[in-house]
């Protein structure tokens, strides 16, 4: 299993959560059928606009999809945050230490 640091995490103008890996790309993430997508231009994984799931649940889904693709994504000391409220950031950070595909 490869490990990659998450360069940045944010919420875009459409309300979608995105996660940008430092070095890995995921052009085939759609094959996991998890509603997680790869944005080629922004070089990031992203969720649909949350409906029933919270942003934390979508973060776990993105991390799980990457795990199924053979990469463990980890939040690092240098991870940048964009458009994420402090309480949501804390919740995402708290969830990042859990098993990548547990209880999504």
Predicted regions and their residues:
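Accessory DNA-engaging acidic/polar modules
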Residues: 1-104
